[in-house]
Amino acid sequence: CVIKINDKIDGAYVFSSGKNMGVFKAVGYPEDVGRFYRLDEYEAYSWTAHGRYPTNTPGWWGGAHPFALLDYTVVHNGEISSYDANRRFIEMYGYKCNLLTDTEVITYIIDYLNRRLGMPLEDVARVIAAPFWSTIDSGCFSAEETEKIRHFRNVYSSLLITGPFSIILGFNNGLMALNDRLK
């Protein structure tokens, strides 16, 4: 439903759709945004936030992080050079990348792998931040693990996120951090 609204109703976007999760977006200084949304009146066991200075895209409130879908929030820093390949793959499965930001496509990739395919988050990390082939072939993984990682690299090659990045995923009862393979 969220993707349909964001795709079909011109100028309308659903930015927060999770149970027991709120997303607040704005362009401005953090202290002004906090006052505007009266964040001091909320309680939570975890928060994700992002201060963004856009370098490649225009700054607008819809592009502000975190990006959310159902019970996931994603914030990221970096430059995702695989955006077009990632977007083309994920759009084959009904997702629409209307906001044209790499964080949006990361959120949809995580949703697709974890929620729709039932892949555990540890394996999601192995897909989107997969080891280099040379690392896979180095013998540092068990035979079973090597086979699993090879399978992910072959089947989900279009979901490998490339470029320098760090990602924080917030979800019900947890946080997960990922970074590119060169760090």
Where are these regions (language model features)?
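Conserved short alpha-helical segments that host acidic/polar catalytic motifs at enzyme active sites
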Residues: 1-182
